[in-house]
Amino acid sequence: MAKYMISGSKGGSKKPYVPKEMEDNLISINKIKVLLAVSDGECDPDFTLRDLYLDDVPVIASDGTVNYEGVTAEYRPGTQTQDYIQGFTDTSSEVTVARDITGDNPYVISVTNKNLSAVRIKILMPVGIKTEDNGDLVGVRVEYAVDMAIDGGSYSEVMRDVIDGKTRSGYDRSRRIDLPKFDERVLIRVKRLTPDSTSSKVTDKIKLQSYAEVVDAKFRYPLTGLVFVEFDSELFPTQIPNISIKKKWKIINVPSNYDPISREYHGSWDGTFKKAWSNNPAWVLYDLVTNQRYGLDQRELGIQIDKWSLYEAGVYCDQKVPDGKGGTEPRYLCDVVIQNQVEAYQLIRDICSIFRGMSFWNGESLSIVIDKPRDPSYVFTNENVINGDFQYTTASEKSMYTQCNVTFDDEQNMYQQDVEGVFDTEAALRFGYNPTSITAIGCTRRSEANRRGRWVLKTNLRSTTVNFATGLEGMIPSIGDVIAIADNFQSSNLTLNLSGRVMEVSGLQVFVPFKVDARPGDFIIINKPDGKPVKRTISKVSADGKTIELNIGFGFDVKPDTVFAIDRTDLALQQYVVTTISKGDDENEFTYSITAVEYDPNKYDEIDYGVNIDDRPTSIVQPDVMAAPENVKISSYSRVVQGVSVETMVVSWDKVPYASLYEMQWRKGDGNWLNTPQTANKEIEVEGIYSGNYQVRVRSVSASGNASPWSKIATATLTGKVGEPGAPINLTASDNEVFGIRVKWGMPEGSGDTAYIELHQSPDGTVENSSLLTLIPYPQYEYWHSTLPAGQVVWYRIRSVDRIGNVSSWTDFVRGMASDDVESVLGDILDKIFDTEAGQEIKENAIDSANKIKDQAQSIIQNALANDADVKWTRVQNGKRKAEYGHALELIANETEARVTQIEELRASIDGEITSSIKTVQEAIATESETRATQIQQLDSKFTKEIDGVRKDTSASISDVRQTITNESEARAQAVQQLDAKFTKEINDLDGVIKTEVEANISEVKQAIANETEARVQADQALTARFGDVESALVEKLDSWASVDSVGAKYAMKLGLTYKGQQYSAGMVMQLSQGSSGLISQILFDANRFAIMTSSTGGTFTLPFVVENNQVFINSLLVKNGSITNAMIGNVIQSNNFVQNQQGWRLDKNGIFENYGSTPGEGATKFTNEGLKVKDANGVLRVEVGRITGSW
């Protein structure tokens, strides 16, 4: 039997699958709609969802990743005509439909109402469940779409949506379909895209529950930037997210030549603007000031702002500087949101602080200055500052900050506030740790925050303030301008002369009145007439320091007394920024006080580029003891000058620290030490030396005047010129020059090393009586010796002295004489007379002088009588007879003056031809610039009568004016009186009108003047009488003055006639004055006859002195010294000790000359036309020549 293996397994129970049901996840969701007003005014139109941030996360990232689904947004740039945002807010009318939407049965909504803005559909899914094969209950997915056909056109899809999830209780959602513009109708078709389910396991029907016809409110909000954001509430279930937008914002006015994207300025700006986006702080400021919606000009006052200074600031802000990461960036940007109302002044200051600016009102407009590199606009020195006084104030060390913590909005961290610390190590070593903090307005870059902090530290460390007062030059600089200050007190404690006023500028040479401590390579700065300083390089300075030569001329006319300053290579001018300018009060209205703060021109490269530049010192600190020069060397060289070999000694030495000048002394053999002019060089040349042994020593001098000990004496034997200098040749002295002698000479060949000519004078041509007259610089070849009396004789001799003190031999004496030619002397005196005021006075005829005085008096009277006061009249009339009284009283007090005027006038007349009047005017005026008091009295009478063709007019008047005037610079008092009497007769006959005029006039003008430059008193009086064509005048003029450049007195009395068309004159003028022409003391007479008369007790007159028709007659004359060109003897000429036949001498008109000597009884001599006779002491005739008579 076969065996079978039976096998099997143990049976058991398997746990059955339990179906699962997912939770309902289709829940009706609300839409979040947010409308943000993001800007007042037009903004840049570009906007995408990449610019929109929800809780600091962009809706769409820069790489295109969508961070938030279902977010929509609309943007309006804030234009005047912008469209409204659809869907916010609206009114609607809902229509119930409750129709299933299947793939074969879409639903069409017809819209014909053109006022509708949109149609809002509501889709309902009553149940959305799917049963899986394993019994699980899950959600369904149904996709649907909305098509639109416009005015009979074809359908196009406008929206596609999907419902994905599970719901048992039903789920609905609303979707807005915006309507376009149409003419007739719009068809909206709602269709199902997911095929309809045929399985009982799937329940996914959808239906159009209803639709609403929507009319938007259509609020455009013109000129307001808008952002509308819409998203499902499920994205942020707990709270509304923080919504922010990062984009270009405001469109503002920018220059027409400006590209805000590349930040470049093309060509020159014509002052016009265009609209564009910009975050340049200068143009942001311009918008804030000029905008009439939200800016400073909301009242539409037309606020003026200096756009040219803003242009300068804008260009500076856009310049590229290192960004600290290897690239570049604009220097300053303004990324700021102004959300609240703020004070305008504070806002302007905050915006200006972005670009280191300062705002001020310049009298016409709001002006902006920025702290940037700039040249000084004017130079102030001790010369053009009142009292030469600069007052300095230095801040406390506590305010010297060494660390600055800058708070800014970091763009790399979603504009969260951060702090950038800036530390100055060098300052901390000096002042310690001293922090400060600032908030950087509009700053979003860490690199810019660092620059702002560095600027705070560098600027604050230069905190010295200067105050000074000046004259009208204070009107030249403006707030924010850089000025240069040359203060000899501050720079060198008066040890250096580095500023002053020029005497003259000629070509490349500048002449100054004192020694200037300038050197070649230094700079001289001069203020141009328009105020702008001009700098030129110095090529050479004369030995006396008074002549400066330039490399290049100034190119404009430099007036004398123009201020200059020296900018040395080792000592810079101080520079300051003007912060305030204030005008003086009434007493000092032409003075200006200026306050300025220290300016550092080197800080900008350190702030922007981190470059440290060593500053030149503005003051010098020198050692008390100077070192002596070392390595003193002596050498020589020769050169040929005009065929003559000239040897030159050269002395050199090493430079000494802190030395500004050097002094050298030398001597030949054992002679005296000779000085050379101080020099800033390390070498001196002595030209024209002679052969011999020379010794030299040198010492250094500091700028403060400290001198070192002399160096060791250096010795050398040099081969130079042999012998002595050549003596001058051809010495002459004139004898035909009036009141002087002209001395001339020549020089021999080889005299090029001559330094000067030594001129001696002698009254008699002897060495014993000679004396030094003067030293004449070579190569001058003549000398004018004046003033000498006519006929004076002087003897002269000269010798030459070379540059190193060697002297030539003396020339022989030559004789010179001041001319004794009377005709030449009188001609010269006459020319000098007419060059003086007295000469011009006596030259003018008295009638012309009288007319000038008369016209001056009438002008003063008429000007004083001019008055527009309203005179009230009282009149009484009886027929042709009229009596009138006028009176005016006027009182005025207003913003510019106080004035009181009183006028009183009395008139009496008959038929208008016989009149008499008295007028009195009194007036007192006080204004801000002048006071004036005037008193006038005028008496006037007129009589006119005509009988039988003969008309006679007579008039008489007296005018009297008293006036005082004072103002800030002058006081004046005037007294004018004029008496006038006239008679006119006219006869009408067949031949015409015969007119005769007779007039007598006295005019007197007196005035006293005192002002800043002179005091003067004048009294002029003129008496004139005229009958027809015949006229006479008497004039008396008194004048006394004292001024800054002259002092003197003058008196004139003149007579004048006009007779038969010819003028005649007589007069006298006296003048005594001292001025630029020297002392003038003279009395001048104009007369055909000038006589001095004496009278006796019996009434007899004699004439001791008479000038008649150009001849002088003298009755008796005693002359000590006299010179006669031609003389005639009318009787005899004899010595004053003459005694007939005893002593003295005598020459008579018959030609007999007798000479008895000075002692009686010593013999005698007698000359006649017939012979010569001599007798001895006993009276015996001893000699007889010619005709022999044998008797005396």
Swiss-Prot record:
Q: Does the keyword Ubl conjugation apply?
A: yes
Modification note: Ubiquitinated by the Bil antiviral defense system; about 20% of CTF is ubiqutinated when the Bil system is expressed in E.coli MG1655 and infected with this virus, or when this protein is expressed in a strain with the Bil system.
Task: Kindly give the Pfam families that the UniProt entry links to this protein.
Answer: FNIII-A_GpJ, Phage-tail_3, Phage_Tail_Tip
State its location(s): Virion; Host cytoplasm
Q: Which InterPro entries match?
A: FN3_dom, FN3_sf, GpJ_CSF, GpJ_HDII-ins2, Ig-like_fold, J_dom, Viral_Tip_Attach_Protein
Q: Which gene encodes it?
A: J
Identify this protein by name: Tip attachment protein J
Purpose of the protein: Attaches the virion to the host receptor, inducing viral DNA ejection. During tail assembly, initiates distal tail tip assembly. During virus entry in host cell, strongly binds to host receptor in an irreversible attachment. The binding induces structural changes in the tail leading to viral DNA injection.
| Domain Fibronectin type-III, chain residue ranges per copy | 628-722, 727-821
**What assembly does the database describe for this protein?**
Homotrimer.
